[in-house]
Amino acid sequence: MAHVITNLCMHDGSCMEVCPVECIVPGKPVEEWPSYYIDPETCIDCGACVPECPYEAIFMEDEVPSDYEAYGDERMSMPEGTEGFDEEFESEDVDGVVWVLKATRVLDEGEVVDLTPAIQRNEDYFVEGPGYDALD
């Protein structure tokens, strides 16, 4: 069972720096794939990425919450054009690269959201999306 990066990810990249098997890839193009993604076939479930994420966006696959209760002020990102996600968020990753996420929104304190769609989206990134080619 792999770890999953959810839509709470704001493209920081700290997780990628600590992964011992280099299975974490930044989403590109960011308009379509706004998070970082973990290859479920390569992830060894070491958990090194979890404490590194400043957005607390990483969960074990079987622990991704379907009823995540926001503490307030955290953001969710979605592919550009997703209804209700119309705020831009500028993020600088650990390498100093600036990413502009064009489809985000701030969660209200106590708001409950389902983060489980990230499980399939994470897998799709490596099957249908760019996967490791995004590193080129």
Please name every model-derived segment:
Residues 1-12, 22-45, 60-69, 133-136:
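Ferredoxin-like iron-sulfur electron-transfer modules
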